[in-house]
Regions:
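C-terminal motif of bacterial Sec signal peptides marking the signal peptidase cleavage site
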Residues: 17-20
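Short, linear, compositionally biased motifs with a strong N-terminal bias
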Residues: 11-12
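Conserved functional acidic sites
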Residues: 22-258
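Bacterial N-terminal signal peptides that target proteins for export
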Residues: 1-8
Length: 258
């Protein structure tokens, strides 16, 4: 599902930033709920309002399933991500289970219907998410959006998960018992080093049980900075019902704007 690769790519061009908050209250989610489900044929569509790119666009993710990728010499779970932007098109993402966390491989492409890595090296985000996401977890990771190409920047991130007592409302519906992840991101190297200016961002991501990511908000600077990016779920298609978008226990019937 869409996370922050597109945001990172946009921000490095304009050198901009993102935010978070905390929650308290009783959390009633099923302890066995999956907050990042990746079942074959699941589909998510998001609308993206990007002030840094000065654009609004849609992103659709579809789970293809487990595949062996000869070019990378590994087996992973493949998700296809489609951006309705010029020169964007369809891109594969691969998820790997490693040490209790998911590793996310992106920056990949299709060449004659086969997954290939770019010449400059793929983007690899270890410790992307815990395999079993729960509130009150903390972890850190480092992201290389353009691989380890000389002159490229990197992002050091610290994450903490919280229970979300309030319903989360997006175009796809109202979702209860969500988990919110607050991420503090420090951008350095590459263009930031050349301008002698590092960048500190904060992200908030909301995950709904058995649905996955339903909203991301990015703010410039710290938690009180101006909003720069907003990503919201407009359509979710579960494996059991591919004919129409569905949402699990929601207080309002889902809408289907995309």
């Amino acid at each position: 599902m869409i996370k922050r690769m597109a945001i990172a790519a946009a921000l490095v061009m304009g050198v901009v930033s993102v935010s978070g908050c905390k929650s308290a209250g009783e959390w009633k989610a099923d302890p066995n709920a999956d907050f990042f489900p990746l079942k074959t044929d699941m589909v998510w569509t998001y609308r993206v309002n990007s002030k840094s790119q000065r654009a609004n666009y849609a992103v659709t993710d579809r789970v293809i399933g487990m595949q062996y990728v000869p070019a990378l010499k590994l087996t992973g779970l493949v998700v296809e991500e489609f951006y309705n932007l010029d020169r964007a098109g369809l891109r594969p993402i691969i998820y790997l289970d490693q040490g209790g966390f998911l590793t996310r491989l992106s920056g990949l492409d299709y060449v004659e219907h086969r997954i290939q890595g770019p010449a400059w090296g793929r983007s690899e985000e270890q410790n992307f998410l815990p395999e079993h996401l729960t509130p009150d977890r903390e972890w850190k990771n480092t992201l290389f959006p353009y691989g380890k190409l000389p002159g490229s920047f990197d992002v050091t991130q610290s994450h903490k998960s919280y229970m979300e007592p309030a319903d989360v409302t997006v175009p796809a519906g109202h979702f209860r018992n969500c988990i919110r992840i607050e991420t503090r991101a420090h951008y350095e190297g590459g263009a930031y080093a050349q301008q002698k200016q590092n960048l500190n961002l904060t992200y908030e991501d909301w995950y709904a049980p058995n649905v996955g990511l339903v909203r991301t908000v990015a703010y410039q600077g710290g938690p009180n900075g101006p909003e720069m990016e907003r990503v919201e779920l407009t359509r979710f298609e579960a494996v059991s019902d591919k004919a129409a978008p569905v949402t699990p226990p929601a207080t309002v019937p889902p809408q289907t704007n995309s």
